C-alpha cells in the first residue's frame, strides 16, 4: 500500500451478527495491525436485501472517507431506518458510456422473457458492431415469480458491472406490476415505456396509478400498450408472450432496423424451438409478425 494512502474502506457482502466486524474488514485490519502510520480503516456492508450497489453508492463511500470522522460499520444500497447505518447517495451518477442504450424488462417467471432477452443480446452481438451486456435478477420462486432483465447496447465497450439505474426503455410484461413495483424508477426523460395489458385505452387511463401517469407526463415518456396475452392465445402459444414482446421491443427501441431484427428473431426461433417441431416454430414466427 503506498504511503500516501491515509484511509481505507472495506466492503463486505455479508452480515456477521455478534462479530466485531465482517470477515474481509477484519482481515484488512489484521494486515495493518501494529504497523507504523497505518491508515484509518472503516468497514461497510453492501448487497443486503438483494440491493446491489451502483456508482452513486460508491461515491457515497468516498464521501464518507473524505469526512473528518468517517462512519464505521455503514451500509450502502438500502435505507436503514432502524439502526441508521446507511450512507445517503447524494450524487445521481450514470457511468455508462455516452450513446449506450439501457433497457429493463419486468417479466413473470416462466413467461419466456429472460430467454428472449438472451436471444436479443446474441442477435445484436452477432449481427452488429455494437457491444452488448445483460444481467438478470430473479426472486426466489422457480416459476411464477418476478424477473428483471437489464440489457445494455452501445458502440463503446460497456464496463458497467451493476444493474441498470438509468434506463432508456422499460417494458412491463405483467400489468399487475404497475400496482406492486415502481417499474418506471430510473427511466430517463424522453424514454419509452411498453406495457403488456388486457386493458383498453380507456381502461388504461382509468386504472393506471396516478403517480405513474404523472411521471409519464412530466418526463415526456413515450407510452405504448400491447395485449400480448390475447395475441399469444389466438396463435396458440398460451402464456408465452416472449416473442411478441421482443418484436415490439425491437420496433420501439430502434437499436437495429426492425426488418433485420425480425429476420434474426425468426432465425433464433428455429435455433431455440426447432426440435419441438414445425408447428411450434410457425406459431412463434406468427407471434413475431403479429
Regions found by a protein language model. Give the residues of each.
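A short, terminal or domain-edge coil/loop segment
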Residues: 39-49, 59-69, 185-193
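A structural signal for alpha-helix termini and helix-coil/disorder junctions
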Residues: 34, 64-68, 271, 275
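C-terminal non-catalytic interaction/assembly regions of soluble proteins
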Residues: 1-51
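Core alpha/beta catalytic barrel or barrel-like domain that forms the active/cofactor pocket
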Residues: 39-41, 75-80, 136
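Flexible inter-domain linker/hinge segments
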Residues: 49-102, 281-290
Amino acid at each position: 500500500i503506498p504511503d500516501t494512502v491515509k484511509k481505507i474502506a472495506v466492503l463486505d457482502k455479508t452480515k456477521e451478527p455478534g462479530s466485531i466486524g465482517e470477515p474481509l474488514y477484519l482481515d484488512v485490519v489484521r494486515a495493518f495491525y501494529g504497523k507504523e502510520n497505518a491508515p484509518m480503516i472503516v468497514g461497510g456492508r453492501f448487497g443486503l436485501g438483494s440491493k446491489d450497489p451502483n456508482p452513486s453508492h460508491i461515491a457515497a463511500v468516498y464521501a464518507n472517507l473524505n469526512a473528518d470522522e468517517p462512519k464505521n460499520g455503514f451500509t450502502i444500497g438500502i435505507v436503514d431506518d432502524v439502526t441508521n447505518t446507511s450512507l445517503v447517495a447524494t450524487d445521481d451518477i450514470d457511468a455508462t458510456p455516452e450513446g449506450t442504450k439501457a433497457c429493463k424488462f419486468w417479466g413473470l417467471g416462466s413467461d419466456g422473457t429472460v430467454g428472449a432477452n438472451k436471444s436479443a443480446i446474441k442477435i445484436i452481438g452477432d449481427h452488429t458492431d455494437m457491444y452488448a451486456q445483460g444481467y438478470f435478477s430473479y426472486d426466489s420462486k422457480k416459476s411464477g415469480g418476478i424477473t428483471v432483465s437489464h440489457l445494455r447496447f452501445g458502440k463503446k465497450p460497456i464496463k458497467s458491472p451493476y444493474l441498470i439505474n438509468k434506463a432508456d426503455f422499460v417494458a412491463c410484461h405483467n400489468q399487475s406490476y404497475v400496482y406492486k413495483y415502481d417499474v418506471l424508477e430510473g427511466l430517463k426523460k424522453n424514454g419509452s415505456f411498453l406495457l403488456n395489458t388486457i386493458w383498453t385505452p380507456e381502461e388504461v387511463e382509468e386504472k393506471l396509478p396516478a403517480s405513474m401517469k404523472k411521471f409519464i407526463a412530466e418526463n415526456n415518456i413515450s407510452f405504448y400498450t400491447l395485449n400480448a396475452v390475447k395475441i399469444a392465445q389466438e396463435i396458440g402459444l398460451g402464456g408465452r408472450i416472449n416473442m411478441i414482446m421482443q418484436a415490439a421491443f425491437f420496433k420501439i427501441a430502434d437499436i437495429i432496423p426492425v426488418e433485420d431484427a425480425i429476420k434474426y428473431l425468426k432465425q433464433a426461433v428455429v435455433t431455440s424451438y426447432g426440435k419441438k417441431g414445425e408447428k411450434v416454430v410457425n406459431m412463434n414466427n406468427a407471434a413475431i409478425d403479429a
